[in-house]
Amino acid sequence: MATERSLTPDQIVAYHRDGYLNLPGFFAADELAPIQAALADDPSVGGRIATVHDGSEKTRHDYLGWTRHGDDWLGVATRLARIVEGAAVLIGEPVYHYHSKLVKKPAGRSGQVVWHQDYGGWYQDGCLMPDMLTCVVALTPATEESGCLHMLKGSHKMGRVDRIRDMDAYANINPKRLVGMLARFEDVAIAMQPGDGLFFHGNVVHRSGDNRAGYDRMLLEFSYNGVGNAPVLGNQDHHAAKPMKVVPDDALSNGDFLGVIGSTPLNDLSDPADEGYTIYVRDGFPDLS
């Protein structure tokens, strides 16, 4: 299924130069209305939203996660041609859905996420190459006040940076190295309005701040991997390359989905026994079997 909204040559160049690509108005208001209404009606999604803490028990944010996709709004959005084809062009090979998250920073909550690389965690999953990226879609305004993303522009060119602890996906970067990174790379705040999109490389160093605003900051984060880069380590069946039926760009606006949050299996990211637990937390190094 080909997209009618292909990335331009200039956009592709910008992504590889900077490590990210802003896409204003990537989703229309009517496309987002169903998921926004569902979250307003049931903010905890039936109690399935979990909370992430850092090592000091400072609350970060609330989230849902999924690795498989159904035919509800969440599952269809995951498979939209404009996202999947864009990811494939930027990665340089066909892609599959790795995992996705709804990330919410409640109003007024301390919810910062420290500087990190996503591929630092995905490498622990067993992905040998950084041929991975995330597509972010804003559901509410993301500003400096509400805790928007920050990118170190061009930092993906460093390659994978060693982590100084291995207990979760946001393990710290060595502080001395981080000082050098902040001196070398421009710190860019990524302000987003509802519907704006963002592709960013698995190796770009990024963070987000506390939400000091009077509303919840909510983002959808769809992550994709090259089909030839599936994890080689054990206990990663949920991250294996899976067939994905790509849907037309107008699927959401045409209402071609069955419910909003329903048939897409949501992972219990607070339960270490759940297959999708490693979307966020990794207990040291994964099983080498």
Predicted regions, residues:
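Non-heme Fe(II)-dependent double-stranded beta-helix
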Residues: 1-18, 23-126, 164, 235, ...
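Short edge-strand/loop segments of extracellular domains
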Residues: 105-106, 152-159, 223-229
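Active-site glycine-rich loop that binds ribose-phosphate moieties when present
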Residues: 114-123, 137, 176, 183
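Generic beta-strand structural signal
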Residues: 93-100, 111-113, 131-137, 147, ...
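A short beta-loop-beta micro-motif enriched in histidine and acidic residues
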Residues: 83, 121-132, 185-186, 192, ...
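Double-stranded beta-helix
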Residues: 13, 142-205, 209
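Non-heme Fe(II)/2-oxoglutarate
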Residues: 45, 49, 55, 197, ...
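Short, conserved beta-strand element in jelly-roll/cupin
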Residues: 116, 125-144, 191-194, 223-227
